[in-house]
Amino acid sequence: MTDKKIIVQFTMLTFFIAFLVSGALIALGPFGYSVHNWVHTFQQFMMNIPFAIYILSPAIASYIVLKKNKKVANFMEWLKTVFYVKNSLFPYLFVVAGLALYFAIHIAVSGRTEMALPFYTLLLSLPGNLIIGGLEEAGWMYILQPKLSKKNGFVLSSIFTGIIWTAWHIPLFFIPGTNHGEGLINFWMFAVQVMAFRFFYGAIYTISGKGRVFMCVLFHTMFNAASPIFGTTTMTWAGTITANAAMVLVSIVTVVMYDKKHES
């Protein structure tokens, strides 16, 4: 009952924060509000703050709900779990391999090898993508998907979380200045990727021990930082289906092998 209560509280609070803030930003669009992917002025930085609150809604809800239900004593305890980096080398290699596999398949299928941005921009954008992107997993993978997995198993919990995550992303396609809102990202391709990636996050969580939440945060951060570098390379249906099918397959095989190893 406690897990179910926490899931419901977390999901409701996440969507309340997300849709309240994003709704306000959409309403302010005609009056000049816009998100800025690259910040050059203090004004642009300030305009990104409310957008960051929307994106951080799963993390905000995670702490509030866990604190309310006495699952964490204070913010520092919550933060230590989210940023527990003392892991074995294998989960780090798995995260990097997942990124390499995804983008390599897209490049192979699309036949495009040019980069839209220099590779060093990945490093420059990591801090921003930690806040606007990576820390979502402090909610999705600290509370929602793991607790759903306890009752429903790996596959169904990945699907259920993917559906919720897709719905949570919908306002992005209406907020001025986002790649989604500017038409640079196809909603249905994005939905396929979102659903597939929940399987990969589930696999990361399964193999990563005490640092499981951080490893999911790391993958999300690195993926968001890497995506702009490849530009439209990832925007083909052939690549979308092939790359995401591969991610799902790798995830399922990884979890099955892990479970068999730890049962024996």
Predicted regions and their residues:
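Residue-level signature of the transmembrane alpha-helical core
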Residues: 15, 56, 96, 122, ...
